[in-house]
Amino acid sequence: KDGTPTPKPSNTPFLEFVGTVKIPAAAKFIIQEKFVLNYGKKAKPGVRIAYLSDNFKQWFLDKIEEATPEAVLRYAKLTRAALDDEIRAEIGAEFEQTTLAQIFARMALQPDGREGALLTNWWATIFYVPDVKGVLRAVSVHWDADYGGWYVSADSVGSPDRWGVGRQAFSR
């Protein structure tokens, strides 16, 4: 989030459709086994993660997601700065929730920051995921080329900070 001031009301949509991606079915997904730091010169093959925010660790590391079927996710670019509530309203409550297994599946296709559906220019790619207690959170991932890994953060969907233009949001 970038602290962009509140804009004047507009009839322009917040989201511009970019595309869809297929996410394979996932077995039971144990978050603390997958979302682990793995970056720098000693990085092992696989997804490189350089940072997990304190909120992410508190809200998600103890979570286990049950098996999920194959899914198609949509992603869209923000055309103007937006709050989570504004993004979620445009996505629609029935389509907003994704899973950490789905996020990780996307990261696995771009394990070292190569081009793909996730942004790799340090800008956030946003997902809405229920935490270990079922509370919906904004989970964002962005690539840090300096550290050679993904930054994974979590925020309250009630945050007063706006996501900047050009960020992307995923939904079902």
Regions found by a protein language model. Give the residues of each.
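A binding-site-centric feature that preferentially detects glycan-recognition modules on secreted/surface proteins
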Residues: 1-95, 102-172
